[in-house]
Amino acid sequence: MAMSGFGTHVRHQPSAAIIDLQGEINTLAENVLNAAYDEAVSQQPEVILLNFSQVDYINSTGIALVVGLLKRARQAGLPLIAYGLSEHYVEIFQITRLADFMPLFPDEGTAWRAIAIWVERV
């Protein structure tokens, strides 16, 4: 699913959905991003992971779109986890306090290990 420099791919795993993001997250990404989220929750996952490893650019509107996904996930009682952000965007997520509400991990393997530890504690 691609649109003006942005695309997604949703992968379903047992109890989780991973949304692979590619390209630029800006105004043009809104419909594609929301459709990917809808597809991800259609399988009733226990957690959603956002894979930013192929994201080239996120503008302020893109940050707002991520906040919108976070809001939807929180309303549904779903943890939203991000991984693969560049150092620059990790810093932006920390400055904007998104990282306070959405755990950030360097890669998918690290995110899965954290999820496994979290599941053991619950």
Enumerate the language-model features and the residues they cover.
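STAS-typified acidic loop motif
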Residues: 2-35, 52-54
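Conserved beta-strand segments of alpha/beta enzyme cores
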Residues: 7, 101-103
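Short leucine-rich amphipathic alpha-helices used at interfaces
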Residues: 7-8, 47, 88, 116
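Acidic-residue sensor for enzyme active/binding pockets
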Residues: 24, 91, 108
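Amphipathic alpha-helical interaction surfaces in cytosolic regulatory modules
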Residues: 27-101
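A charged, well-structured terminal subsegment
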Residues: 104-122
